[in-house]
C-alpha cells in the first residue's frame, strides 16, 4: 500500500496450504509466526525439512500459541540488521533517536536459533545521523502519515526493524515499543 521496501511474502492460516506452497519454494526462506512470540517466532529455514519443522511448530505443536495460527513465509534477505528508534506524534512529527543492533542467535558467531536477544549495542557505527534521517523518512514517516489519514492517533515510540541489503534497506518489522535488549 505504501510502497515500503520489504521481503516478498505470502501468508497462510492452515497447515495443508502452507506445506503445499513450501513444496514449490527455493531456500533459504523465512517462516514467521504472525503474532507476539517472545522474539522466537522467526525461523530461518535452509531446507524443506527445516520448513516442515517450523510449520509443525506453528500449526501442530502450537509452540507459539495463537501467534502461530497464521504464518508468514517470506523471502530470505541478507545484510546488516538495524533497529531504528523514533518518537512520533499524530501531527506527523518524527524524531529519530538512535539506531541499535542486537544479537539474536543463541550461539556465538550468530549461529543457532533466534532468542529474544542476547545483547545489543548502540549507536550502529555504519548509520550516520544523515542516514538515520533518510531511513526515518523512507520507513517511518509514510506509516505515520498513513495513520493520520486514517484518523488513527498515535503518539509514542515507533521502532522499525530494518535490514541493509545490497539492494538497499528493507523493512523487517515494526513495533510500537522500545526494543529489548536494545534499550538495556
What are these regions (language model features)?
Residues 1-41:
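A conserved helix-loop-beta module that forms one wall/lid of the active-site cleft
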Residues 41-183:
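Internal nucleotide-binding/catalytic subdomain
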Amino acid at each position: 500500500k505504501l510502497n515500503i521496501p520489504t521481503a516478498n511474502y505470502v501468508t497462510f492460516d492452515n497447515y495443508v496450504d502452507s506445506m503445499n506452497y513450501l513444496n514449490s519454494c527455493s531456500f533459504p526462506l523465512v517462516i514467521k509466526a504472525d503474532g507476539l512470540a517472545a522474539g522466537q517466532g522467526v525461523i530461518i529455514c535452509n531446507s524443506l525439512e527445516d520448513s516442515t519443522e517450523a510449520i509443525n511448530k506453528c500449526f501442530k505443536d502450537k509452540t507459539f500459541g495463537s501467534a502461530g495460527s497464521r504464518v508468514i513465509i517470506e523471502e530470505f534477505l541478507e545484510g546488516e540488521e538495524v533497529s531504528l528508534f523514533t518518537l512520533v506524534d499524530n501531527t506527523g512529527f518524527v524524531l529519530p533517536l538512535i539506531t541499535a543492533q542486537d544479537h539474536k542467535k543463541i550461539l556465538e558467531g550468530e549461529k543457532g536459533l533466534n532468542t529474544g536477544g542476547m545483547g545489543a549495542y548502540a549507536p550502529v557505527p555504519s548509520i550516520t545521523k544523515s542516514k538515520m534521517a533518510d531511513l526515518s523518512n523512507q520507513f517511518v514517516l509514510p506509516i505515520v502519515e498513513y495513520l493520520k489519514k486514517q484518523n488513527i492517533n498515535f503518539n509514542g515510540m515507533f521502532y522499525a526493524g530494518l535490514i541493509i541489503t545490497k539492494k538497499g534497506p528493507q523493512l523487517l518489522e515494526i513495533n510500537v515499543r522500545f526494543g529489548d535488549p536494545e534499550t538495556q
